[in-house]
């Protein structure tokens, strides 16, 4: 005869199971209740008037909390869901850095070989100093390039509008630059017999598929067209459909500096793979997290974020319980951010379809880091 388990025991087991599920950790390892996190996030979204959000929390190398919240557009009021696609903006750089290190592991290029030896760059060839630029300099923002030639303030007596130039000699100081990533992406495409329009399939093969990033692309496709949500600036729907830094750029380009399209669950898969050291050699993983350049205390990254150095595609920030590795993204109408603690493999990542991401990041960090 089979004995029945008393109802009270069943209830207790259910409560214990629910309690363990809802008990989360901050990046330092402090306990956090999932219901409290729900309320906190909702409060921040309401106070900042954020339309939509994709958010994930990682504990011990696993996603333990994932939310798709808000609306895809303030006009249509359609709900954000788990298939909604956001712009990663500059968080693209961390993913591209990993892609580059995959190529280094394959001996296609060396971090310290000048890039012109692989592919001369006509855009800057009149300044011989560009021949000093290496992949390491690109990924640590020491190329000397401006962020973007079309947007940065330039000396109009020296450079025409749209002309690429060097602000400083390569390798001498930190100068955040998307232009460097542009050049390196051209090199990676060239070394693989591809173009900037045909590079994304290689990214899928080398990074997205192995790390189980089901929805993550640098170039446009039908899935993005059907699932990408709408950006917002100052509470108004943005008219921009694709992020661009060049007049001739369109969705076919592989934009290494800011073109990744994805959401929090898939980006978490990347962060988990990175923290676990999957896909690249241990020495290159360590190189990625190693400080390549110290930041000046007057740097905006130091003053605003507390970053003291830069690795390969990632910022380094000391905190009371160790070190946080982070990156943000800002395409204006889409913003994003992630922070990870490599020591305990805890972290978080978010995407929002508005210009309030930096403010949200500060608020969520108060709960999950400070």
Kindly give the residue locations of the regions a language model identified.
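Short active-site loop at a secondary-structure junction
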Residues: 48-54, 75-137, 166-179, 255-258, ...
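Short, well-ordered beta-strand elements
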Residues: 326-327, 335-354
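Extracytoplasmic/secreted proteins, especially bacterial periplasmic and envelope-associated proteins
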Residues: 32, 36-43, 52, 90, ...
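Short, gly/Ser/Thr-rich active-site loops of penicillin-recognizing serine hydrolases
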Residues: 291-300, 351-370
